[in-house]
Amino acid sequence: MTLSFITRWRDELPETYTALSPTPLNNARLIWHNTELANTLSIPSSLFKNAAGVWGGETLLPGMSPLAQVYSGHQFVVWAGQLGDGRGILLGEQLLADGTTMDWHLKGAGLTPYSRMGDGRAVLRSTIRESLASEAMHYLGIPTTRALSIVTSDSPVYRETVEPGAMLMRVAPSHLRFGHFEHFYYRREPEKVRQLADFAIRHYWSHLEDDEDKYRLWFNDVVARTASLIAQWQTVGFAHGVMNTDNMSLLGLTLDYGPFGFLDDYEPGFICNHSDHQGRYSFDNQPAVALWNLQRLAQTLSPFVAVDALNEALDSYQQVLLTHYGQRMRQKLGFMTEQKEDNALLNELFSLMARERSDYTRTFRMLSLTEQHSAASPLREEFIDRAAFDDWFARYRGRLQQDEVSDSERQQLMQSVNPALVLRNWLAQRAIEAAEKGDMMELHRLHEALRNPFSDRDDDYVSRPPDWGKRLEVSCSS
């Protein structure tokens, strides 16, 4: 089957990119590709037989027209000015059979005009982390970019140490970022901001294109998508680590996996980025940061969208987020209805977990085994203050009984939203260290496991992390 690529970005937004081709790596080797995703995109298996080929930037497929995008952004609250694709190149937009499109974006593709002080390369460590994280999030049901392939090489890349250069093929419906809009707003080119908005509406919100109120309705939906995404992050214990405005997806996708982390111990102020000294992007601050970022996006639209309309959309953010968060947390607790004491029960559980540094994922998974008429629970053994747990658990079981739902039905619901497996940093690190020694078995094994996060397991993928695994520090270097 012939793949079809179109050039909407190149044709319709001529001042938002620089056209250039990838710079291949030395002795590139394909070490992993996403068979399931490739099948979804109708990519023939024969394409993966050329280990470097398009995956390593050596060739282009017919219809591809590679370019590096320019955008700007706020980083840690500070205006950073022009940024852009410093090591990534958009190879093309694949046109799928249903009329939708998928960007093919090659990360680690070499120097671009937006590389600033960088070398345009990515290392094997970071490409493995992003491939694992994006696929883990996808199978958790959270909107995200996807990973299609990883190529390693003999090209040395200099970070804190010398590491092997690598490339990741990332795919997504769009790479539109808040930072694209900021770039032209701060250059005082509001007509180009409007062109970006029109492009987004035309291709991703086409049902609004002929509506005279299209900009207000569109921004309302951007706010809603962002609120929903952040709510989902919070419920699975995901910390992004670098929520700069240039890393915010207009479509509400999880974008740019750098120093991310999933909660091990329940620590509301968890900071996964060792460069975040003030805790700007801590786990519990993510909802507020996302709203701040939306306010920056709204500012760029103010030349052609009424300020009252923008503020009305921003004012809806908190309620949308709380609605999505509340619905998912009630499911995680096994509540079939909404009752006034639900928030108090959840907050008391969080307080108990924080005091005891309980494992976030394991606590909710074990809670899924609760029988409403039995005081026995394997979760009890996880707590030191058994009296405090017993008091909370008795009230929790009383709340379950109000719903008049069988244990089996409730347990099935809870186990479908409380994963047994999340991508803990130590699991990723183990796969990385093996891969850097030439052993790709753990990378493939972990990828396969992450496809079924809600299935029970009896291996170390679902155990508490070792002490060294909790102390892993992750930086933005990639």
Curated annotation (Swiss-Prot):
Record's catalysed reaction(s): L-seryl-[protein] + ATP = 3-O-(5'-adenylyl)-L-seryl-[protein] + diphosphate; L-threonyl-[protein] + ATP = 3-O-(5'-adenylyl)-L-threonyl-[protein] + diphosphate; L-tyrosyl-[protein] + ATP = O-(5'-adenylyl)-L-tyrosyl-[protein] + diphosphate; L-histidyl-[protein] + UTP = N(tele)-(5'-uridylyl)-L-histidyl-[protein] + diphosphate
Q: What is its EC number?
A: 2.7.7.-, 2.7.7.108
Tell me the enzyme class.
Answer: transferase
Report the domain of life of the source organism.
Bacteria
The molecular function terms of the Gene Ontology recorded here are:
AMPylase activity; ATP binding; magnesium ion binding
Q: Which UniProt keywords apply?
A: ATP-binding, Magnesium, Manganese, Metal-binding, Nucleotide-binding, Nucleotidyltransferase, Transferase
Quote the catalytic residue positions: D246 (proton acceptor)
**Residues that bind ATP:** G84, G86, R87, K107, D119, G120, R170, R177, D256
Cofactor requirements of the protein: Mg(2+); Mn(2+)
State where Mg(2+) binds.
N247, D256
Pfam families in the record: SelO
Its family remark reads:
Belongs to the SELO family.
What is the protein's known function? Nucleotidyltransferase involved in the post-translational modification of proteins. It can catalyze the addition of adenosine monophosphate (AMP) or uridine monophosphate (UMP) to a protein, resulting in modifications known as AMPylation and UMPylation.
- Recorded protein name is Protein nucleotidyltransferase YdiU
- This chain is encoded by the gene named ydiU
